[in-house]
């Protein structure tokens, strides 16, 4: 019996080892499996090109360019000549040691980046020499190549995945790139494509010797899907040019579709600054600009009092609730008086009907309208509840649900706010009368106010604003961008509002913005402007606000312009909006002197005033 036992044990052990090796090499070849890494298989990724990005007219905005990273797999590093490698990579020994330790901390068996984005010259020099350093290799990747210097806030940028993203999403490995902002982030899963994979058999010295299974399991990379945006890059670039040396935002929307034609945040930034080895340095410079804040997308994030443009929303609510008609007349006499206070007005007329109230932006008219809407119901709470619901139906006070980064919701006051502020039953329409003229507690973002104009252009409905028109040459399949959202206002009430806005353009507060051959409905605006600097509250020059739709007969563009510290609406925002409309509808700007005034207009001195430690004046 004993003479058979030893051979049996040897045979059994051999069979177990063979079966184990067979299992590991054939069935358990996932790249995240340490067993394969230890024994026989090397996984090499072939990175795809990201999808190209085009504007609405088919102009290519973003393509790709090759870049090369020096990678390390710590478990494969052997017999390392640190000084020679540091010399080749132009790294100090301390810097190299730190990078290598971080790679080990991440994973001893997965690749990590040691040097990002070699130049083509450095790559040519290092390509052959890297073979002598076991565990190190050069990985080709695709970086973005921007064919435009505009729309940085729209396009966004890509950067290396961070530790949190590596833990959250197993698709990514250290050193890989991901959309970080803008369209690059929002449409990452469409743009990134699919990595190709190659498996190599390794010998006992850990060197790749042949394709595993003759490449039967290998896959080719699949390029990301192309995107066609809704923006007109010519209009976008023109808007950024007009907003040079100014802070604020321009949003232009096609009312019939909700497609965003331009999304200008100023100051803007060149997206190509965030590509290449200087990306980190350039990002830091942009981030540290505490006054201009070019990385802060004002079109989506900045919450401003809408000022007088909000009067048209109050007028629509008044018409819907039956508290006014287009023929309703209110006296002005220099302002609206309430409880020993006066809300001043500069319309210059003793009394106004609705159309003149809009055209001349009469504060008294809209204060009376607002008070009636709030107080003529069974209680002010009921009136306020209805008012809040009407305002929110225009997309205000909430996220619009666009395909852009989330942004901010703005603010629409409600009964809970005033019950908390004044006490239940202890307030009425005059307690918050500033809401009548777009100040008080109400706040909007530029994209929200442009969307209000789109809803007015459509006489009661809007499409959710969106930035992508086609994915992979097919119309976007998202129903939320093709189904209209209706306001609570009956369509019949929009005609007098549009006529009043047209009067503002022809003979009222917006008359300076007239364009030959284009009939516009417009509304100017401004609001008081307070900020805190080092804990001290101070008042600055008012913002310049302007909204419009054009042409009146068949609106093709709805626009909102905010210019911080620009003073009154017709001073800066109005001219900029009219130039944008002219550019879009005519394809060219013919008012060259008017254009030159806006191009040369700088408000940098206004933005520095609160930080110079000197006495200053406002609204000059």
Predicted segments, located by residue:
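Cytosolic-side transmembrane-helix boundaries in multi-pass membrane proteins
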Residues: 601-602
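Beta-lactam-recognizing serine transpeptidase/beta-lactamase-like catalytic domain environment
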Residues: 62, 203-208, 213-216, 256-308, ...
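Periplasmic/cell-envelope proteins involved in peptidoglycan metabolism and beta-lactam response
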Residues: 1-280, 303, 383-393, 436, ...
């Amino acid at each position: 019996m004993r003479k058979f036992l030893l051979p049996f044990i040897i045979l059994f052990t051999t069979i177990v080892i063979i079966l184990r090796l067979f299992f590991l090499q054939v069935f358990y070849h996932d790249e995240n499996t340490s067993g394969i890494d230890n024994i026989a298989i090397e996984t090499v990724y072939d990175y795809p090109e990201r999808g190209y990005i085009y504007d609405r007219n088919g102009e290519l905005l973003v393509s790709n360019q090759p870049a090369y990273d020096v990678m390390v797999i710590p478990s494969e590093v052997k017999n390392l000549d640190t000084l020679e490698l540091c010399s080749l990579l132009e790294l100090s020994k301390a810097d190299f040691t730190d990078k290598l330790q971080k790679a080990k901390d991440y994973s001893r068996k997965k690749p990590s980046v040691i040097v990002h984005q070699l130049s083509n010259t450095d790559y040519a020099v290092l390509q052959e020499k890297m073979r002598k350093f076991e565990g190190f290799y050069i990985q080709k990747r695709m970086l973005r190549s921007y064919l435009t210097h505009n729309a940085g806030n729209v396009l966004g940028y890509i950067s290396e995945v961070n530790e949190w993203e590596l833990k959250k999403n197993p698709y990514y490995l250290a050193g890989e790139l991901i959309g970080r902002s803008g369209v690059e982030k929002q449409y990452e899963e469409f743009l990134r494509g699919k990595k190709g994979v190659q498996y190599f058999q390794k010998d006992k010295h850990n060197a790749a010797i042949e394709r595993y299974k003759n490449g039967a399991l290998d896959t080719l990379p699949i390029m990301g899907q192309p995107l066609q945006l809704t923006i007109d890059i010519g209009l976008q670039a023109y808007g950024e040019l007009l907003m040079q040396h100014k802070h604020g935002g321009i949003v232009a929307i096609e009312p019939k579709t909700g497609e965003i034609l331009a999304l200008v945040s100023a100051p803007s930034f060149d997206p190509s600054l965030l590509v290449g080895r200087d990306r980190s340095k350039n990002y830091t410079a942009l981030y540290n600009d505490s006054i201009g804040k070019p990385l802060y997308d004002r079109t989506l994030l900045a919450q401003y009092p809408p000022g007088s443009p909000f009067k048209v929303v109050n007028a629509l609510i008044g018409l819907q609730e039956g508290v006014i008609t287009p023929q309703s007349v209110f006296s002005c006499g220099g302002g609206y008086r309430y409880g020993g206070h006066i809300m001043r007005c500069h319309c210059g007329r003793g009394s106004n009907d609705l159309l003149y109230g809009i055209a001349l932006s009469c504060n008294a008219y809209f204060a009376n309208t607002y008070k009636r809407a709030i107080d003529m119901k069974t209680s002010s709470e009921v009136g306020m509840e209805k008012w809040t619901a009407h305002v929110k139906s225009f997309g205000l006070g909430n996220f619009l649900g666009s395909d852009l980064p989330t942004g901010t919701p703005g603010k629409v006051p409600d009964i809970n706010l005033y019950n908390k502020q004044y006490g239940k039953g202890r307030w009425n329409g005059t307690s918050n009368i500033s809401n009548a003229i777009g100040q008080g507690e109400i706040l909007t973002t530029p994209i929200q106010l442009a969307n209000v104009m789109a809803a007015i252009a459509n006489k009661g409905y809007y499409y959710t604003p969106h930035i992508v028109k086609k994915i992979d040459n097919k119309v976007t399949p998202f129903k939320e961008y093709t189904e209209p959202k209706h306001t609570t206002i009956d369509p019949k009430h929009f005609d007098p509002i549009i006529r009043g806005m047209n009067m503002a353009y022809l003979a009222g507060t917006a008359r300076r913005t007239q364009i030959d051959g284009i009939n516009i409905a417009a509304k100017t605006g401004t609001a008081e402007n307070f900020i805190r600097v080092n804990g001290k509250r101070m008042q600055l020059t008012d913002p310049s606000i302007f909204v419009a739709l054009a042409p009146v007969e068949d609106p093709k563009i709805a626009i909102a312009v905010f210019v911080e510290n620009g003073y009154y609406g017709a001073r800066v925002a109005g001219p900029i909006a009219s130039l944008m409309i002219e550019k879009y509808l005519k394809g060219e700007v013919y008012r060259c002197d008017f254009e030159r005034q806006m191009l040369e207009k700088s408000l940098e001195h206004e933005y520095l005033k609160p930080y110079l430690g000197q006495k200053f004046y406002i609204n000059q």
